[in-house]
Amino acid sequence: FFEANIELADPIPQFNLFDKNQVVYTRPRLLPPAKIFGTWLNHSVLAEGSIIHAKKIERSIVGIRSRIGENTEIAKTIVMGNDFFETIEEMMAADVPLGIGRECYIENAIIDKNARIGKNVYIRGSITLPDSETDTHCIRDGIVVVKKNAVIADGTRIGLGA
């Protein structure tokens, strides 16, 4: 799953979403296009409805309605996105708003839907990490998986170098 999705960001992946002979059928969501502010992007796919303020996104997939905060760096990661948008009032009232906060570093990870990742969070998967599981995340085959609807508090460190 992880490698197949990350490969979608390759110049010509094995499963090419732009190949007219390999049609992908989905339902229209009628979302606005992604908005990107000052982000360096390389070999990445961004879905509609996303608002991105990240410093850098490389070799990653960013799903629908994703929010990524300022100065965050993401590498070789699948961000599944969100099922809904939060209002400004909801974001201000939440301890940790929907999406990925500012000043985070995330590498070799899958961030499941509707996850809330606080500010200054460090997540780094590695094949050297043993499989493990907590209420908010698990590590399988070196990939850190943040669970659906999980809340990761500000300053949390997970994985290699934590």
Question: Where are the predicted features?
Answer:
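Left-handed beta-helix
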Residues: 1-162
